[in-house]
Amino acid sequence: LDAGSEAIIVKTDVSKKDSINEMVEKAIQTFGKIDILINNAGIRHVKKLLDHTKQDWDDMISVNLTAPFLASQAVIPHMIKNGKGKIINFGSIASFMGRPDRVGYVAAKSGVLGLTRALSVDLTGKNINVNTICPGLISTPFNQKYAEDPKHGEAWGKETVVGRWGQPKDIVGAAVFLSSDESDFINGSEIKIDGGWLSSKVRKGELDNE
């Protein structure tokens, strides 16, 4: 915005197709085209497996998986008309592993990887790239209660190779890159931004410098 760009806010219920379509049409009316779509809405219920209701499950799938599909479906015709486009879905480290008390979230975020791959194939020849960013422990309002938890917060951060929780700024570079022409040969892929958390489960005393 400091560079003179224009932004609008469109209140949208991403669980509803009509609301998503209205958001897209408002963007087209305002800017004339859509070059980039970032599917980053997300919710998470943390409950024991047997306490996880069907409504909890439906909520997880609707917002975390169905919404990226519907938004992509709404935007893709405009990108085809433009002759190019970039779609960035947001997965999670939960896309690659089970996590306790998060059955719906893990299932939905795993599905995002499949959605990304399928979309990239279906859009062959359309000059539209579809990729996924998979954040790890990022200190945002979404994870605030875990990051600030005196028992687990600092300990979880130290389990990353980098040795800390990530910050929102750690995500920005990947999003900008995947939105740019420099990523034109990357399609149907995912970038993990987790401080090495998935690569090596470091425990205190295991490193040579400790």
What residue ranges belong to the model's regions?
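Substrate-binding pocket helix/loop in short-chain dehydrogenase/reductase
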Residues: 48-49, 56-61, 156
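Alpha-helical segment proximal to the catalytic Tyr-Lys
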Residues: 77, 121-125, 184
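Short C-terminal tail/terminal secondary-structure segment
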Residues: 97, 176, 187-210
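Short-chain dehydrogenase/reductase
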Residues: 1-31, 45, 55-56
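Active-site helix of classical SDR
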Residues: 72, 108, 116
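Residue(s) in the substrate-gating loop at a strand-loop-helix junction
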Residues: 92
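Active-site loop-to-helix junction immediately N-terminal to the catalytic Tyr of the SDR YXXXK motif
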Residues: 47, 52, 98-107, 118
